[in-house]
Amino acid sequence: METSRSRGGGGAVSERGGAGASVGVCRRKAEAGAGTGTLAADMDLHCDCAAETPAAEPPSGKINKAAFKLFKKRKSGGTMPSIFGVKNKGDGKSSGPTGLVRSRTHDGLAEVLVLESGRKEEPRGGGDSGGGGGGRPNPGPPRAAGPGGGSLASSSVAKSHSFFSLLKKNGRSENGKGEPVDASKAGGKQKRGLRGLFSGMRWHRKDKRAKAEAAEGRAPGGGLILPGSLTASLECVKEETPRAAREPEEPSQDAPRDPAGEPAGGEEVPAPADRAPARSCREAEGLAHPGDTGARGEDAAGHRRAEPGPGEVRTAEDASRTGAVPVKTVPLVDSEGGSGRAPAAPDPASVDPPSDPSADRICLMFSDVTSLKSFDSLTGCGDIIADQEEEAGPSCDKHVPGPGKPALSKKNPGVVAYQGGGEEMASPDEVDDTYLQEFWDMLSQTEEQGPEPQEGAAKVAAALETKVVPETPKDTRCVEAAKDASSVKRRRLNRIPIEPHPKEEPKHPEKEQQEGVPNSDEGYWDSTTPGPEEDSSSSGKKAGIPRDSYSGDALYDLYADPDGSPATLPGGKDNEETSSLSRLKPVSPGTITCPLRTPGSLLKDSKIPISIKHLTNLPSSHPVVHQQPSRSEMPRTKIPVSKVLVRRVSNRGLAGTTIRATACHDSAKKL
């Protein structure tokens, strides 16, 4: 019956050899090779065939003969078939001695090819079934059941076959027809598919194993390792699950292989033993230790050795890939003690370390980037100053200059950038020194003014600390930044138009003086040359303050008018907060609501930004503005003390405007 099935289904065997090969879990266990035809012929009979393998050997030879002839034709027939046939032939030659030994006929070569392709497919089939996840348990039980688990093996094989349905459907359908020629053709196709599939699957399986590591970490039950190599997983599962029982079975399995191979020559022993353990190792190992796997297969405790070998080899291979060999090996040992599936679970843990290196690299990269960013922030690069502001702390947060302060020496440039709206940036480096001096002067004057002598002293100390210890740690810098924020606040206050000052009539004349002075100022705030009237009229307090920086100018605004200075400070303090807040929004100075005195109207509360743009008109109409105060000095109280801005605007007509401003100043003073 087997013979007839073998011959009748001989083509089916050869073509279905893929199925039989996949089914070869049992056949592989039987390994006699005679069961190939029987196994391929019937999945159900697969187990029986495993039992009948000895009797099936001769028929298998005949079957292979027919298949080989047909396959030969196939090989010569088509280019692709010939290529695959050549591959098969070459493989057959490589295993040819084994084939001859087994079938004792040259036709056996075809059988060997079929068996090889079947075996090679087996791992894939096992991989498929194992990859199925559900299939994995099935392969495990069949393995545990040994030949007796043929039904389970058949189911697992069926799964694997269904997985390969794309390549095998044609051959299977032809096999189902049972036509020897068609079957052989299908067999050739299938063989071609098997060979190509094996080649592709082999590499693919390696990839699978590589992915299996990750998949193992993700799905310990997935057992991609088993898919990696059915034989390796088979051995691992068998040995590991019930190692005591499995070891005997594996030796027995080896025994059948050895007898099957040895009858004609000892070559078969290395071939089957190597083929199962070594192939499992090679497939699992991904060519990590092919020779070692063979040696393991040959070991007396051999299969146990081989089983751990494949697992270990696989692990070693994966480890070599990931570079975490020791970690994976340990999990494998534990898993071996536990179960065949356990290795997958431990491997995930071991697999994680490999991913960790990449994560570590990423982290390192990020840390490098972060360090670069922090370095940039330390260097005070543009936006990063803002980041430093955040770093500096809440104290710095409220004031843009605060961030600038945390930026150490960059604090002043930062302040300049934010406060001046870019205007003060003309001399950021110089600003630091000038700021220090001006701060001292301003603070000292503030103290003299008496409204906030304590505050001035505190701010002086704060400014001093900030200046003295710009390189202190970040915490100190934050504290200092807070202090600086207050000092900067004052600076801004000085520079910001203070409404209380305008309320004071003397201030208006001062404004006029300022307007005259701006004419003399060629630069923004840098003009150190006071206006002609400035020196004469309000040189008392102006002289002490350097005109270089806007803070000095602001001081002019605050203290230039001796009459308004005493009252100026009180209002100044109040406005200090408001003005500093308004300064905090340098982007939109126009938002500051300041009673703006335009030439057309005496008093006008306008939200027009107090900027040179609007004040530009003032220089030409300064006389009007000045005379307006003469008409009613109280209205002048509403004039914003944003003379600094006006000065900048009036830079255009320095001489003429200065003269006009001087005349206006004199008239205003007279008034």
From Swiss-Prot:
GO BP annotations listed: ectoderm development; negative regulation of canonical Wnt signaling pathway; regulation of canonical Wnt signaling pathway; Wnt signaling pathway
Listed GO CC annotations: plasma membrane
Keyword terms of this UniProt record: Cell membrane, Lipid-binding, Membrane, Phosphoprotein, Wnt signaling pathway
Keyword Cell membrane in annotation: yes
Topological category with respect to the lipid bilayer: Peripheral membrane protein
Origin: domain of life: Eukaryota
Basic and acidic residues: bias regions: 171-182, 236-260, 276-286, 295-307, 472-487, 498-514
Compositionally skewed regions (Gly residues) per UniProt: 7-21, 126-137
Disordered: annotated span: 1-24, 76-358, 391-414, 444-598
Biased composition (Low complexity): 342-353, 447-458
Record PTM Phosphoserine, positions in chain: S162, S229, S233, S355, S358
Single Gene Ontology MF annotation: phosphatidylinositol-4,5-bisphosphate binding
Subunit structure: Interacts with APC.
Family the entry assigns: Belongs to the Amer family.
Function: Negative regulator of the canonical Wnt signaling pathway involved in neuroectodermal patterning. Acts by specifically binding phosphatidylinositol 4,5-bisphosphate (PtdIns(4,5)P2), translocating to the cell membrane and interacting with key regulators of the canonical Wnt signaling pathway, such as components of the beta-catenin destruction complex.
Protein name, as recorded: APC membrane recruitment protein 2
Annotated source species: Homo sapiens
